[in-house]
Regions:
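Noncatalytic carbohydrate-binding groove/subsite architecture in carbohydrate-active enzymes
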Residues: 1-87, 93, 144-158
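Acidic, Ser/Thr/Pro-rich beta/coil linker or hinge segments at domain junctions
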Residues: 196-240
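Beta-strand-rich interaction surfaces with strong enrichment in secreted/lumenal proteins
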Residues: 177, 239-242
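Flexible loop/turn segments at secondary-structure boundaries
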Residues: 1-7, 49-55, 106-112, 151, ...
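Glycan-recognition and catalytic regions of carbohydrate-active enzymes
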Residues: 98-172
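Carbohydrate-binding surface patches
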Residues: 157-197, 203-208, 250-251
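Conserved, mostly hydrophobic/aromatic
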Residues: 24, 47, 100, 128, ...
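Short Pro-Gly-centered flexible turn/kink motifs
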Residues: 243-254
Length: 256
């Protein structure tokens, strides 16, 4: 969680997640080599999510209360950026991470909230939903050249977090990307010459000027994804040129 109110370091948490998965995979492979084993151990990454907003609130709960409002984190926009990056991390490791269940789905540290009078989507719902719908197929070994920054906890962290997923059956390619810079838009180029005949279907962006912006029952669409303008992404001669706004989650879909 972002206890220190340090967004730069908070967004680098996905690098810690990436390093953790790589470390566990390395240990599994080292034991396999030492034992001359043939079985590859795959991973389950269980009960993941951002969780810290409700900690202080829950300390005030009385004991033995019926159906208390417990662990009801209200997620803000920067949480959505991190969840988007965590999903990218899990996709990058899809060769070994075969199951990755989000902790809970409704009310308790969840993307969906309810009350006695309604239900609404939290900020983290959108990268989760869109990645689930369009992040299907074969995860490509996405080589990303990006500037880095020094985070307080995780060392060097990339400004650009990205992965590509190819759906061969539907002749569709989806690019997921997070620009973690808090100050600058990012111009990105991507070599897609192997995807001849593909065209941009849509460029979806999740962004907000206020990193602390939240969705509530009264304002359920304060933070929602929108279609980026045509000037934000173009594909010519097998080269994709795109602009990712500062502190934004992006999804570019291409298809024949």
């Amino acid at each position: 969680g972002n206890y220190a109110n340090d967004t730069v370091d908070f967004l680098a948490s996905s690098k810690g997640m990436d390093d953790f998965i790589s470390g566990v995979v390395s240990i599994c492979d080292a034991v396999k080599a030492k034992k001359h084993g043939k079985k590859q151990i795959n991973l389950s990454f269980d009960e993941w999510n951002v969780w810290y907003h409700s900690n202080e609130q829950d300390k005030k709960l009385e004991k033995w209360v019926q159906a208390p409002h417990q662990l009801e984190d209200v997620y803000n926009f920067e949480d959505a950026l991190l969840v988007g990056s965590m999903l990218i991390t899990l996709l990058r490791h899809a060769d070994r991470v075969k199951i990755a269940c989000m902790a809970q789905l409704v009310n308790v540290i969840a993307p969906i909230m309810t009350s006695d009078t309604g239900a609404w989507r939290q900020t983290i719902f959108y990268p989760y939903m869109l990645t689930s719908v369009f992040g299907r197929g074969t995860v490509l070994n996405t080589q990303v050249l990006t500037p880095v920054y020094e985070s307080r906890t995780y060392g060097e962290a990339p400004y650009l977090d990205s992965v590509c997923v190819w759906d061969e059956e539907k002749d569709a390619l989806t690019i997921f990307a997070v620009n973690k810079s808090l100050d600058e838009d990012m111009e990105v180029s991507c070599d897609l010459r192997q995807f001849e005949g593909y065209k941009i279907v849509e460029h979806i962006v999740l962004n907000n000027d206020d990193l602390q912006a939240v969705n509530t029952e009264a304002q359920p669409e304060n933070v929602v994804p929108v279609k980026a303008g045509a000037e934000c992404s173009k594909l010519e001669g097998g080269k994709l040129e795109a602009v990712f706004a500062k502190h934004s989650w992006n999804m570019i879909r291409l298809a024949k």
